Amino acid sequence: MFAAIAVFAASIQGVFAQQTYEEMERLTVNEQVTTVITATEPIRFVDISTDKIAGDQPINNTIRLKPKEGAHEDGEVLAIVTIVTERYRSQYALLYTTRLQEAVTDKVV
């Protein structure tokens, strides 16, 4: 019995493994483009890790993000955004781009 529990615990350990920045999905952002993130269910909580990004939640399943200013280098990490709903949590690294065509305008989670 105890051996079975130990095997089960070892097998699910990867499911609850810690995620690092390197493993996170990255969204490119630009101060001239609003990035809209839409969840499939109501968003309960949003955290933006720095004050370099402005954000709001105009409706219960949507957030809008935009860099506050444009004095950044290409590829610079401006923030990590965490989105929590009833059933899941998503995290994205927001990377600055000077090229408007690379900025993400819409993301569904």
Residue ranges and their predicted role:
Residues 1-11:
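Bacterial N-terminal signal peptides
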Residues 14-109:
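A general "mature secreted/periplasmic domain" signal
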